[in-house]
């Protein structure tokens, strides 16, 4: 809905570009072990660190086909696409090799590359070597900027706001799951660390009294490789799984929301006005230092926990009326600080987005 309104305000006619999803037929890979000619700059150098030499000696063997044998294929395919004045992306620059090559070629010709956060709350300390900031002409973030060249904008996907609080609703645990193998350089739990997250959540539930546990529902993460939904069913029975159809419905029909990770879901829950907590492994989720004061406030207010026993004790103490705790002065102070640092809340956020895109098109908004 937000995107359609944005198209209308900018007088753009939306269309689907299915060719980005077309199957790519790459050539057969070369025998990388028998490459005869290697650029001198890629050869070993005793002045380099051991790891740098390792990379230089192995990079030709490890480069994906798409960027060696198949790069001409991608160049040819993208040359048939339309020209773009501005390119706006939140996900495609990660997942689509064809989009990456097309957008790079367009940027070389003078297009503006605008990369937006597709979510977030407490941004990771490290994520893909700040690659997005390095390649974007405009880098959009939801909350306070922490790097030069970032532009703060209101979130374009926060819209679930409680109208009628259900004091008899569920206590909802919003779960986390990750892929089976590490896939990105970032300070988030990946691979088997996902099981550590699950074990913490399981132990937390086991610390609750039977009366409170009956009110507990889990919303499993929709994607992932560790089958956490099945694990919850095996450990607690099928009844513990939330029957709500969407994340928004889960949040809005809860008396209390407990998030298992400090990213988009945490922002959505905090924004909703429903009493919200977070229980997570702090050592797995290293975040930007701009949040240090906020983290202290969240912990003091009982919103943030890293200890499952203390979190369970807090839930037990507020389960009867979470809204009373949610409206305490100390809790409100922490909530307001979260909104100040992590969200950009405006009464009509689309106005800011329209203004940004018009300024970029007119050349009036300075590039990175």
Q: Which positions does each model-derived feature cover?
A:
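Catalytic-core helical/loop segments in enzymes performing group transfer/polymerization on anionic/lipid-linked
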Residues: 1-368
């Amino acid at each position: 809905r937000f995107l359609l309104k944005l198209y209308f305000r900018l007088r753009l006619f939306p269309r689907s570009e299915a060719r980005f999803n077309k199957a790519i037929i790459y050539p057969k890979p070369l025998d990388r072990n028998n490459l005869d000619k290697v650029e001198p700059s890629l050869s070993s150098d005793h002045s380099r660190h051991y790891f740098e030499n390792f990379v230089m000696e192995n990079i030709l063997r490890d480069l994906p086909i798409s960027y060696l044998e198949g790069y001409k294929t991608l160049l040819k395919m993208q040359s048939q696409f339309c020209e773009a004045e501005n390119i706006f992306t939140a996900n495609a620059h990660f997942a689509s090799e064809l989009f990456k090559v097309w957008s790079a070629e367009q940027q070389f010709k003078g297009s503006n590359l605008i990369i937006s956060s597709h979510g977030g709350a407490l941004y990771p300390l490290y994520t893909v070597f700040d690659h997005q900031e390095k390649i974007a002409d405009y880098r959009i973030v939801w909350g306070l900027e922490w790097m030069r060249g970032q532009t703060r904008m209101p979130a374009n996907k926060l819209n679930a706001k409680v109208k009628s609080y259900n004091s008899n609703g569920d206590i909802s645990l919003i779960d986390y799951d990750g892929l089976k193998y590490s896939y990105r350089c970032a300070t988030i739990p990946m691979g088997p660390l996902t099981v550590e997250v699950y074990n913490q959540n399981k132990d937390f539930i086991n610390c609750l009294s039977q009366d409170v546990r009956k009110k507990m529902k889990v919303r499993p993460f929709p994607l992932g490789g560790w089958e956490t939904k099945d694990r919850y069913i095996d450990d607690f029975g099928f009844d513990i799984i939330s029957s709500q159809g969407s994340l928004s419905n889960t949040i809005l029909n809860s008396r209390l929301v407990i998030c298992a990770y400090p990213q988009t879901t945490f922002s959505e829950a905090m924004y909703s006005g429903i009493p919200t907590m977070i229980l997570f492994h702090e050592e797995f989720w290293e975040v930007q230092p701009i949040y240090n004061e906020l983290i202290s406030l969240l912990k003091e207010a009982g919103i943030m926990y890293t200890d499952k026993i203390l979190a369970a004790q807090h839930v037990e103490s507020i389960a009867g009326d979470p809204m009373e705790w949610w409206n305490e002065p100390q809790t409100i102070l922490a909530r307001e600080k979260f909104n100040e640092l992590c969200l950009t809340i405006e009464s009509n956020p689309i106005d800011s987005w329209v203004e940004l895109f018009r300024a970029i098109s007119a050349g009036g908004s300075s590039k990175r």
